[in-house]
Amino acid sequence: MNDHQKNHATSQDDNTKSTPSKNSKHIKIKLWHFILVILGIILLTSIITVVSTILISHQKSGLNKEQRANLKKIEYVYQTLNKDYYKKQSSDKLTQSAIDGMVKELKDPYSEYMTAEETKQFNEGVSGDFVGIGAEMQKKNEQISVTSPMKDSPAEKAGIQPKDIVTQVNHHSVVGKPLDQVVKMVRGKKGTYVTLTIKRGSQEKDIKIKRDTIHVKSVEYEKKGNVGVLTINKFQSNTSGELKSAIIKAHKQGIRHIILDLRNNPGGLLDEAVKMANIFIDKGNTVVQLEKGKDKEELKTSNQALKQAKDMKVSILVNEGSASASEVFTGAMKDYHKAKVYGSKTFGKGIVQTIREFSDGSLIKYTEMKWLTPDGHYIHGKGIRPDVSISTPKYQSLNVIPDNKTYHQGEKDKNVKTMKIGLKALGYPIDNETNIFDEQLESAIKTFQQDNNLKVNGNFDKKTNDKFTEKLVEKANKKDTVLNDLLNKLK
């Protein structure tokens, strides 16, 4: 989409020729007079064209007189600073700052302006596609290691294995570099090559890998006894197609009860939420109502429900991280009594964002309307309450402690409570959850540091924080208490 459209006024010359009559020699028009007439016509036509173009432009812009004056003021300030400021300014930065200022004034966390690079990353997240090698990586013990290569990915075909330690990318050391920086080094243009120097056991070798388009699936299926668990990570392009395929596969395996796990699913594409609901809800039914002032629109299902889905009982698992499109889908399934909802109250995001892309690759994302469930429930700031509550262990809901500060005994801070809850979950003796850094916490930290080969000083420093977070994530991934509780309820 271009930044704006130009209106062009097109004129067509009259090419009809008139044949001179025999009396034409008696018609005496001085050449200079003829030229003046023609110039007058051209000038008049030009003035009319310019005025018409300006009027049309103003009408099509949708701006009133006051708004046009404000826009002119912004343009004047931009030109003045660009031309007359005593230090040379970047035109791009001035433009971005002006846009950022307007968006910030909205005080809306969901509206934002993105640069071309940020837009690229955003689109990758929406589509699920990116160019790379298809290797999941993590930073552990100050080393970059491969968690696992994706199936049929360039990394897998090249021989990359789980637990490989990456020491160099294109012969540049990655030791001490942040994980996101290493990932950027690995990614690049499709068809180009990247060389990873990997350490496997005591051996170190270079592996050359050709970059390709990688698709990250948004739906994962796992059979748990006689129940199928379908984890839906986000609503991206073709999430509904992936879900449909997973349901058909589960049905062939004899599964007649599925769990749709939407925990920590932040949402995504609204149309995918509607298509997903259509898997379970027949044609012609409203999935979501959209409202913008007095304007209202209903998004309905366009096909009959999937035959295999009609044979199945459906349970939906949500938590406070289930938001936006996750809530659209859950709300529709709940209103039509197509599923029983378990877990904890959802996030509560009942507004919809629209995207406008510019010709330079940047975009603006802004809130345009609110949405309601088929029965008219507005969940913004309220969330959707489950039919059956399953509480999440405290340690799984903890906020990450900022690593730019070291905490000592005697301090009073909200993050101290997080340390206590986390260490208690990891098996260390803590008998209170106050926000005061006491002797008991210091003793527990010393034991934790000793158990994990860290410097033993009783202070909660960056390295202790990193290991603390790592251990809690490992514990959460190892035993999903909420899912296990639901599976037990369904027996």
Curated annotation (Swiss-Prot):
InterPro entries: ClpP/crotonase-like_dom_sf, CtpA/B_N, PDZ, PDZ_6, PDZ_sf, Peptidase_S41A, Peptidoglycan-bd-like, PGBD-like_sf. Residues 1-22 are annotated as: Disordered. It is found in: Cell membrane. Its main location: membrane. Gene3D superfamilies: 2-enoyl-CoA Hydratase, Chain A, domain 1, 2.30.42.10, 3.30.750.44, PGBD-like superfamily/PGBD. Its EC number is 3.4.21.-. It holds the Pfam family Peptidase_S41. Residues 8-22 have a biased composition (Polar residues). The lineage of its organism: Bacteria, Bacillati, Bacillota, Bacilli, Bacillales. Belongs to the peptidase S41A family. This is Probable CtpA-like serine protease.
